[in-house]
From Swiss-Prot:
Origin species: Rattus norvegicus (Rat)
Taxonomic lineage from the root: Eukaryota, Metazoa, Chordata, Craniata, Vertebrata
Chain positions recorded as Ca(2+) 6 binding sites: 278, 280, 282, 284, 289
Annotated positions of the Phosphotyrosine modification: 47
Binding site for Ca(2+) 5: 242, 244, 246, 248, 253
Residues binding Ca(2+) 2, per UniProt: 117, 119, 121, 128
Function in brief: Involved in regulation of vitamin K-dependent carboxylation of multiple N-terminal glutamate residues. Seems to inhibit gamma-carboxylase GGCX. Binds 7 calcium ions with a low affinity.
Gene symbol of the encoding locus: Calu
Chain ranges for the short sequence motif Prevents secretion from ER as given in the UniProt record: 312-315
Protein known as: Calumenin
Phosphoserine modification, residue list: 69, 261, 277
Major site of localization recorded for this protein: endoplasmic reticulum
Length: 315
């Protein structure tokens, strides 16, 4: 399926989805959870393992002996200590946890990288991305299906330029990640806001009124009554979204809606790990302090064996 067919299919699917009276579109960007486990260190350290390693890598540590687990953890600590001062700070731990938290994003970028890096130089230029994505349209700007791809391409180019911090129109892997997942980067949040405003602000007055807000997430189906969640969203708009009560959301109000300041779970977990492992209470961790508490950070066959006994007893 070429790009035109894909986008037309996507448009039809979107239209079909929006026609369902009870289906809701959610534009709010939330941080992914650190783990789906309960955080209860009195029972086990599964939550901490997922937060520190990521859920998939945490499973692999359950197959290691304690000695193997400690050795592998030591190698991870060397990578976390980015300034190579022999200590792991709360900030360095937070960065590690954030990376594990967003592993699915990095995996998504890796899966797409080879498709766009046409000359295999480890970078993706705007020309490479445009040619792969819009090559068919560039060859035939007036397609038979009548679909106009130019606005989409212009929007992509604007976002690419925003992600490209040094302005050379060539994206590193980190810049390409920011292009594909702008909501994850502080310096890209303005473009997320701009694109959202363009999508919802139908009369282009620079604001989102109540009907535009509801219309973006709900398509009214003839004479059918509005579902309860739509009535709730109307109340949310009046009571919470429209903070200055002028009947519409400006850019700041819209930004607060789609990019809320969530509780920072990664920071809280980093603080917890330091508190539990910092034997000399100097506010930072040595490699030895971390490895001594390997069961908290990563676990092993031994720690999982204890949990397995509990699970066996439950059966």
């Amino acid at each position: 399926m070429d790009l035109r067919q894909f986008l037309m299919c996507l448009s039809l699917c979107t239209a079909f989805a929006l026609s369902k009276p009870t289906e809701k579109k959610d534009r709010v960007h939330h941080e992914p959870q650190l783990s789906d486990k309960v955080h209860n260190d009195a029972q086990n350290f599964d939550y901490d393992h997922d937060a520190f390693l990521g859920a998939e890598e945490a499973k692999s540590f359950g197959q290691l002996t304690p000695e193997e687990s400690k050795e592998k953890l030591g190698m991870i600590v060397d990578k976390i200590d980015t300034d190579k001062d022999g200590f792991v700070t709360e900030g360095e731990l937070k960065s590690r946890i954030k990376h594990a938290q967003k592993k699915y994003i990095y995996d998504n970028v890796e899966n797409q990288w080879q498709e766009f890096d046409m000359n295999q130089d480890g970078l993706i230029s705007w020309d490479e991305y445009r040619n792969v994505t819009y090559g068919t349209y560039l060859d035939d700007p007036d397609p038979d299906d009548g679909f106009n791809y130019k606005p989409i391409m212009v929007r992509d180019e604007r976002r690419f330029k925003m992600a490209d911090q040094d302005g050379d129109l060539i994206a590193t892997k980190e810049e390409f990640t920011a292009f594909l997942h702008p909501e994850e980067y502080d310096y890209m949040k303005d473009i997320v806001l701009q694109e959202t405003m363009e999508d919802i602000d139908q009369n282009a007055d620079g604001f989102i009124d109540l009907e535009e807000y509801i219309g973006d997430m709900y398509s009214h189906d003839g004479n059918a009554d509005e579902p309860q969640w739509v009535k709730t969203e109307r109340e949310q708009f009046v009571e919470f979204r429209d903070k200055n009560r002028d009947g519409k959301m400006d850019k700041e109000e819209t930004k607060d809606w789609i990019l809320p300041s969530d509780y920072d779970h990664a920071e809280a977990e980093a603080r917890h790990l330091v508190y539990e492992s910092d034997q000399d209470k100097d506010g930072k961790l040595t490699k030895e302090e971390i490895v001594d508490k390997y069961d908290l950070f990563v676990g092993s066959q031994a720690t999982d064996f204890g949990e397995a006994l509990v699970r066996h007893d439950e059966f």
